[in-house]
């Protein structure tokens, strides 16, 4: 496999640095959409409460709130580079970001608990709703990370 990509030509004039924000935003949107698509599919396929407890949607809602909280704070506000201090300043931005990450990790851990505690350990015939809850939260979590850290704020330099 040493010469696998040697025949393909990548354009040298293609500047991926200028398109970084676009690519990261599209990738994060696709991940977020895929997460909600999976859980909607599970809710439609298993509408009865004994097959899929619909209170499990709470994890996805909390993951979505965490997604919004994480991305509401810019990296400049966390570093203290912004021109205005805002409502609580740099410390408030860091606390807000920390709470957002706590909610994101908490919803991901809760979705694993739902998968294993509610479907695998009970040896249910249908495990797909538990897998759907986990993948929904995983996709939303990774979409939030891509949207937060995949973009850059220094377009003018």
UniProtKB/Swiss-Prot annotation:
Its main location: membrane. InterPro entries: UPF0220 (IPR007919). The keyword Phosphoprotein applies. The modification N-acetylserine is found at residue 2. The chain crosses the membrane at residues 26-46, 58-78, 95-115, 126-146. It is a multi-pass membrane protein. The modification Phosphoserine is found at residue 2. This is Transmembrane protein 50A. It comes from Mus musculus. The lineage of its organism: Eukaryota, Metazoa, Chordata, Craniata, Vertebrata.
